[in-house]
């Protein structure tokens, strides 16, 4: 919104600063952070009044989790508020990619909100049926994927690039649409599975959003994209503002989610943030890089798949409990130890992911 003030540069030269993507990205970071800081306490108090006993705690989980009883959930509301306000305020809203990604994020947030609401009202950990949730996620992802493809240019809209290789792309044609939907739905559920300990998911999300903030800027800049020999996608630079908003909102939320958490993001936040990362990776043509940068989310998801498959096929469990973070808790690791070590893994994977921009 503020971008359009740059059109008045002829009258007020100082307004030219709103043309600069880096300035607006920084503004989005600070705005989203301030929104979370300012409105966070009020949102938490409101959630406490509405939820009473807070998020239901799994009876078969680690015993240390029983102390979390009464902690409100749906804290993702403050994240979405921060991201939404900051994006609308600082991004160039004439770019279709901004709307496609933002609306998908809010749509996934709505699915998560419904899931959290049912968990609270039914007083169990199930929420929406898995089938209904998946259908809603896939439906929204297909719409967003089609929108993104229509905004693209020629064959590039349906191409898949491989990291570490120069100019190696595959044109998937219309098969790219189900692939893009898979990326968005998969990323959404992967972050959701990771969100099981205080601060565990939000920091890796923040790290991944920071990486894609840079990627969006580079992909949207023809000079940098040519230098790095990565695909140039016009208009994607504005997603740096969106990713900056996620970083800022995540910092603000972490203030309240740091152990011991005052609030959980719930599916409201985790489904939305995962979907956002997936959508940005699709737009910037760095879907496989997301699997590297978000490798922690992949590990958590694979641990669940392996656990379920092993139990159904052999009757035995590979892990003491899935997702993976619960396995280490069951082995005796303290919750802060698990969280911080997983943060370190996320940082290492982010560095590896960034290296794909240059190592070709």
UniProtKB/Swiss-Prot annotation:
It is an enzyme of class 2 (transferase). Keywords: Cell cycle, Cell division, Cell inner membrane, Cell membrane, Cell shape, Cell wall biogenesis/degradation, Magnesium, Membrane, Metal-binding, Peptidoglycan synthesis, Transferase, Transmembrane, Transmembrane helix. Coiled coil: none annotated. The chain crosses the membrane at residues 27-47, 73-93, 98-118, 134-154, 168-188, 199-219, 239-259, 263-283, 288-308, 337-357. Pathway: Cell wall biogenesis; peptidoglycan biosynthesis. This is Phospho-N-acetylmuramoyl-pentapeptide-transferase. Belongs to the glycosyltransferase 4 family. MraY subfamily. Its cofactor is Mg(2+). GO terms for cellular component: plasma membrane. GO terms for molecular function: metal ion binding; phospho-N-acetylmuramoyl-pentapeptide-transferase activity; UDP-N-acetylmuramoyl-L-alanyl-D-glutamyl-meso-2,6-diaminopimelyl-D-alanyl-D-alanine:undecaprenyl-phosphate transferase activity. Catalyzes the initial step of the lipid cycle reactions in the biosynthesis of the cell wall peptidoglycan: transfers peptidoglycan precursor phospho-MurNAc-pentapeptide from UDP-MurNAc-pentapeptide onto the lipid carrier undecaprenyl phosphate, yielding undecaprenyl-pyrophosphoryl-MurNAc-pentapeptide, known as lipid I. Pfam families: Glycos_transf_4, MraY_sig1. It is found in: Cell inner membrane. Its EC number is 2.7.8.13. Its main location: membrane. It catalyses: UDP-N-acetyl-alpha-D-muramoyl-L-alanyl-gamma-D-glutamyl-meso-2,6-diaminopimeloyl-D-alanyl-D-alanine + di-trans,octa-cis-undecaprenyl phosphate = di-trans,octa-cis-undecaprenyl diphospho-N-acetyl-alpha-D-muramoyl-L-alanyl-D-glutamyl-meso-2,6-diaminopimeloyl-D-alanyl-D-alanine + UMP. GO terms for biological process: cell division; cell wall organization; peptidoglycan biosynthetic process; regulation of cell shape. It is a multi-pass membrane protein.
């Amino acid at each position: 919104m503020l971008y359009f003030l740059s059109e008045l540069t002829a009258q007020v030269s100082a307004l030219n600063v709103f043309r600069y993507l880096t300035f607006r990205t920084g503004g989005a970071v600070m705005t989203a952070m301030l929104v979370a800081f300012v409105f966070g306490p009020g949102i938490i108090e409101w959630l406490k009044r509405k939820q009473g006993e807070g998020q239901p705690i799994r009876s078969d989980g680690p015993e240390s989790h029983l102390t979390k009883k009464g902690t409100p959930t749906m804290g993702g509301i403050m994240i979405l508020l921060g991201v939404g306000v900051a994006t609308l305020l600082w991004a160039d809203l004439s770019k279709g990619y901004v709307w496609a990604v933002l609306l998908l994020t809010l749509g996934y947030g709505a699915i998560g909100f419904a899931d959290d609401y049912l968990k609270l009202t039914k007083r169990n950990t199930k929420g929406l049926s898995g089938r209904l949730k998946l259908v809603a996620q896939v439906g929204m992802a297909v719409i967003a994927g089609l929108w993104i493809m229509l905004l693209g240019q020629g064959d590039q809209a349906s191409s898949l690039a491989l990291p570490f290789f120069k100019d190696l792309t595959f044109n998937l044609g219309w098969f790219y649409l189900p692939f893009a939907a898979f990326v968005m739905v998969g990323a959404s559920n992967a972050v959701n599975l990771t969100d099981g300990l205080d601060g565990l998911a939000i920091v890796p999300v923040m790290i991944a959003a920071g990486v894609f903030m840079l990627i969006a800027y580079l992909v949207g800049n023809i000079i940098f994209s040519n230098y790095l020999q990565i695909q140039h996608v016009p208009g994607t630079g504005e997603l740096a503002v969106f990713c900056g908003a996620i970083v800022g909102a995540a910092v603000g939320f972490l203030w309240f989610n740091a152990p011991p958490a005052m609030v959980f993001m719930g599916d409201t936040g985790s489904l939305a943030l995962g979907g956002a990362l997936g959508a940005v990776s699709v737009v910037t043509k760095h879907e496989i890089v997301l699997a590297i940068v978000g490798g922690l989310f992949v590990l958590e998801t694979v641990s669940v798949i392996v656990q379920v498959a092993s139990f159904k096929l052999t009757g035995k469990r590979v892990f003491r409990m899935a997702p993976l973070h619960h396995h280490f808790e069951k082995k005796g690791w303290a919750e802060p130890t698990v969280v911080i070590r997983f943060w370190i893994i996320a940082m290492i994977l982010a560095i590896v992911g960034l290296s794909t921009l240059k190592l070709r």
